[in-house]
Every structure is written in C-alpha cells, then in structure tokens.
Amino acid sequence: RDRLRSRGLGDVYKRQIAMAGYTAANNIFGFLYVTVNAVTQACMSFTSQNYGVGKWKRMDRVLIDCLILSFVAMMILGNSAYFFGPKLLTIYTSNSKVIQCGMEILLYTTVTYFLCGFMDLFPGALRGMGRSGVPMILSIIGTVGTRIVWIFWIFPNHRSLDILFISYPASWIITIVLQVICYYFVRKQLYAKMRAEA
C-alpha cells in the first residue's frame, strides 16, 4: 500500500514537472509564433492585393519569398531559442528538472518550427485568393486530428515526453502535405479562370 502510494506521488510529481516544463517552454514558443504569423499575414495581404488586380504570377513570387523569409527567420530564431534555452527558461523557473523538461520540449518544437511556418503559409496564400474554408478544415484535420491519433494510438505504447512532442513536427508535416495539394488544385482552378477572363 505504501509502495503504491509513493509510486502514485512520484507520478504526480513527474506530471507537475512536465507541466511546468511545458508552460515555461510554451512562453518561448509564443515568441516564435508571432514571427511566423507576421509572415503569414504579409503573405495573405500581398496575395489578395495581386489577386484583386489579376497579377497571378506575382502571387507565386509572394509565396516563394514568404517561404524563404519564414525558413530563414525560423532557422535563426528557432535554433537560437534552443541554444539559449537553458538561460531563457530560467526566466520562468529555477528548478533544474523543469528546465531539463523544457529543453526536451524545445528540441522538438523550436528547432523544427520552420515547418509550422510552411504549414501556415499555404493557407495564408489560399485565404488571399478568397479560399478559406477548405484550408481551415485541412488544418484542423492535419494538426488536431494527427495529435489525437498520436495520443490515443502511439503515445500509450511509448510514454515519454520525446514521443509526445514528436507529434508537433509530425502533425506539421502532414498538414503541409494536405495544404500543398489543396494549393495546387485551387491555384490551377483560379489561374484557368483568370486566363479565360483575360
């Protein structure tokens, strides 16, 4: 009985450490999101402006430039966040175990955050073309759907923070594939329509 009780308390302590580590890491993670979102909003704005005046070749250039900008920004900021992670995490906690846990989370989220930027840019471009419904559904399926499947079917067999947070880049990759396919067909349809009207 005492053994079970101490084991239960140990599990609670581990969960508290994991939650504190995630909370601290998520604060750093938020700064990266602001950068990615700024590039996505720029992509959407410039795409919609060019779409409005029928400059469809410029829309491709906008997306390519934004993909490059997002990639470069996230490689610099994401890797810097991980490199300076131990120091940055001390802003939020002094517990060494929480910092270690936060670093595990940062490894799978900040270093690969350029994937999240790519995932957001294709829907941003599609919204600029007046198509928002399908990209929204694909984003929900790709991110939320993948993580739900991951938590219920993969995580129970390999219960560790590493396996749990690999679901982030995995869901981003799946969503990117879905969004690129959607972008290809929408672009093809819109460009055919624009050529017919020209």
Set out the residue ranges of the language-model regions.
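Interfacial/gating helices of multi-pass transporter permease domains
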Residues: D11-G30, K97-M103, R131, I166
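Short alpha-helical transmembrane segments in multi-pass integral membrane proteins
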Residues: T47-T112, I154-A198
